[in-house]
Amino acid sequence: MVYVHFAEGFEEVEAVTIVDLLRRAAIDVKMVSIMEDKMVEGAHGMQIQADLLFE
């Protein structure tokens, strides 16, 4: 299991590429927001909905 953490202003291409490659390799991936909400906005306005909130 891999946890990929997201914060406001993340680099969209870098984050999405990592998640995509891991999932293609059949590795279980969870996207985790370290913000107060599961919806996190990247550096260029793209929004990602995380699977989990970091508490």
Where are these regions (language model features)?
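Extended, subdomain-level signal for the structured scaffold at the beginning of enzyme domains
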Residues: 1-55
